[in-house]
Amino acid sequence: MANKPRTRWVLPYKTKNVEDNYFLGQVLGQGQFGTTFLCTHKQTGQKLACKSIPKRKLLCQEDYDDVLREIQIMHHLSEYPNVVRIESAYEDTKNVHLVMELCEGGELFDRIVKRGHYSEREAAKLIKTIVGVVEACHSLGVVHRDLKPENFLFSSSDEDASLKSTDFGLSVFCTPGEAFSELVGSAYYVAPEVLHKHYGPECDVWSAGVILYILLCGFPPFWAESEIGIFRKILQGKLEFEINPWPSISESAKDLIKKMLESNPKKRLTAHQVLCHPWIVDDKVAPDKPLDCAVVSRLKKFSAMNKLKKMALRVIAERLSEEEIGGLKELFKMIDTDKSGTITFEELKDSMRRVGSELMESEIQELLRAADVDESGTIDYGEFLAATIHLNKLEREENLVAAFSFFDKDASGYITIEELQQAWKEFGINDSNLDEMIKDIDQDNDGQIDYGEFVAMMRKGNGTGGGIGRRTMRNSLNFGTTLPDESMNV
């Protein structure tokens, strides 16, 4: 009878079974070498992620060593806030389990796909985090070797969630001057010296430069119909800055990209030098462009509306989907620089100045006053949405019906002055001119507003107008259609 194969172990010590301490739940993700589960600590109820690696996929001692090194590197970097924190590791006869911090916001890659590309200020913030991770790795003697948007997770679904690095499966410890020859990484992000099989930590800066390029335009700098074609483009090192949106992107941003995607690793910026580059350091050099003339135009149109129409727009804004208001939510956060939840006069003025608006302070003050329906002195999120949603939302009948029904409290088919007084009270608004407003809308002079009169009021004076920049937010980076379906590993 043949002897059973001896069980091999990754960890140098015996552990409990992972299920002694945790309940394993739903599958969160499936990778080439393992499956990630939601797990819950049995005593504390804390929710974490558990990456389980089947030992049957570890074919030789080198594979076992690689898993151990991944665990060691995660512990080594665990104090850095933008690295996914490992809690503990477990091993049984069939699997190795890495229990780590749960990041519920999804991959950076998915957000790029959803948004198309980022503003310069947002891209600068993200790349500062990414290169900060690179600097932390290098300062601690680690080369990541597989930096890509798929390996960065957001801590939550909030737009301002922390970005954290994960998946150190290809990472290695290194000493100063040490060179590697193993061909690893992912095709779009691999540095030329990796293709030449003689490289060091500089390869991570190249990969981060590719990510920055994608953040700003939505597509990678080097791509072709085949993996070999991609490698050929990488070795040629020619960057494309002629097509949109590059003509409108600052020279400082392009300067940084050129220095990160320098083909000679000895001339390439270090991670620390990237973090000291003016585009990263100076907000004025890496400008956000949160507003354009269309926003000013919409605020002006909003200022000319009566309060019923303003309130109806707010009701409509509150029922729109996240997809529809996603761009405006971003815009609000960009303007609300102190994250107070309201936009002050100074914040509105600063935002307009950043995009070269020449409105006088008195005009900006008037726009704020018009949007500030509850007269609090600032614009809250609901007021901002109401003032800036595209007026084509008024072409959708279901939106108008919903808004009318909000004011028609008794569902009589008419809005009365008493119902308006009740609505005004709900919104915290004082207005003694309701009689005059009803007269302006009430075409048959019966003292109340029917649905037809309400629709006429809502659609009166609405131009088609331009976009607020949401077109770019909805562009899709889809490597399966726009680009070759080749986001494979090298």
Swiss-Prot record:
Reaction(s) catalysed by this chain's protein: L-seryl-[protein] + ATP = O-phospho-L-seryl-[protein] + ADP + H(+); L-threonyl-[protein] + ATP = O-phospho-L-threonyl-[protein] + ADP + H(+)
SMART domains assigned to the protein according to its UniProt record, in alphabetical order: EFh, S_TKc
Family (UniProt): Belongs to the protein kinase superfamily. Ser/Thr protein kinase family. CDPK subfamily.
Sequence ranges assigned to domain EF-hand in this UniProt record: 323-358, 359-394, 395-430, 434-464
Superkingdom of source: Eukaryota
Positions that bind ATP: 28-36, 51
Enzyme class per UniProt: transferase
Lineage, top ranks: Eukaryota, Viridiplantae, Streptophyta, Embryophyta, Tracheophyta
Role summary: May play a role in signal transduction pathways that involve calcium as a second messenger.
Modification Phosphoserine, positions: 186
Species name: Arabidopsis thaliana
Residue numbers binding Ca(2+) 1: 336, 338, 340, 342, 347
Methyltransferase recorded as keyword: no
Binding-site residues, Ca(2+) 2: 372, 374, 376, 378, 383
Pfam families (alphabetical): EF-hand_7, Pkinase
Keywords from the UniProt entry: ATP-binding, Calcium, Kinase, Metal-binding, Nucleotide-binding, Phosphoprotein, Repeat, Serine/threonine-protein kinase, Transferase
Activity modulation notes: Activated by calcium. Autophosphorylation may play an important role in the regulation of the kinase activity.
Tissue-by-tissue expression: Ubiquitously expressed.
GO molecular function, one term: protein serine kinase activity
Protein kinase domain segment(s): 22-280
List of residues binding Ca(2+) 3: 408, 410, 412, 414, 419
GO biological process: abscisic acid-activated signaling pathway
EC number annotated for this UniProt entry: 2.7.11.1
Domain notes from UniProt: There are 3 contiguous domains conserved in the CDPK subfamily: a kinase domain, an autoinhibitory (junction) domain and a calmodulin-like domain. The autoinhibitory domain (286-316) inactivates kinase activity under calcium-free conditions.
Positions of the catalytic residues: 146
Name of protein: Calcium-dependent protein kinase 12
